[in-house]
Regions:
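Flavin-dependent oxidoreductase catalytic core characteristic
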Residues: 1-212, 216
Length: 218
């Protein structure tokens, strides 16, 4: 599938942002590294993560119009975050902000409140294999029915993770998702070896990162 014009623009904007980050990293190294300038290191860590996340969305953005809109919205937000951290600290970064001037129309379009409002309740197609769709549905249902109703109490009172949450996750196989089958887990190796664990973590985190999403990663 050929890329839409907006996805092509997003790819160009992301490439420019990555180049700016690379330049700033070199500036940071030349100035003594993170210990000598923790503010720049902190900002770069955030921006670099957003740039790479936006880049990873490009393939997804080529799968359809909604996917493209989601990708472009994230890329535009990434640019906004980059610029907000850069302006006033250009010398610290060693970067010229005008490199992103050509991205203005793209950011204006995809950060428009009306566009984001129309997008906010849209669930992007997941494009998962059938087995992973089943994993997602299973853990989304469990998170909604079991984790979410208990989350506020645990967070508000700094309570322990309820035993029924732990035992319930054990019953549906949460703690064996990344364990190889030869050790009585569910991971069969291959390219998607840990995908089920990632999907389960994401769905549990929707309800509560503290008593859901973090459990199986610990």
């Amino acid at each position: 599938m050929s890329s839409s014009p907006d996805i092509q623009t997003a790819a160009s904007v992301i490439a420019t942002a990555r180049s700016m980050v690379d330049t700033a990293v070199n500036t940071l190294i030349a100035a003594g590294g993170p210990d000598a300038n923790q503010t720049l290191a902190y900002d770069l860590a955030h921006v670099a993560a957003a740039v790479e996340t936006a880049s990873s969305l490009l393939d997804y953005g080529n799968k359809g119009q909604l996917e493209s809109d989601i990708t472009c919205a994230f890329a535009a937000d990434m640019v906004h975050d980059l610029v907000s951290r850069l302006i006033g600290r250009e010398q610290l970064w060693g970067v010229d902000p005008s490199q992103l001037s050509s991205a203005h129309a793209f950011v204006q379009k995809y950060r428009d409140p009306a566009f984001l409002m129309a997008l906010h309740d849209q669930q992007g197609p997941r494009h998962l294999a059938q087995d992973f769709e089943m994993v997602q549905d299973t853990f989304r249902s469990y998170a909604t029915k079991e984790v979410a109703p208990r989350a506020e109490h645990v967070h508000r009172h700094n309570a322990d993770v309820p035993e029924e949450i732990i035992s319930g996750l054990a019953e549906i196989g949460a703690f064996g998702l990344s364990v190889p089958v030869e050790y009585e887990g569910f991971s069969e190796g291959g390219e998607g070896e840990y995908m089920a664990s990632v999907i389960a973590t994401e769905e549990l985190s929707r309800a509560s990162l503290g008593i859901g999403g973090s459990l199986i990663t610990r």
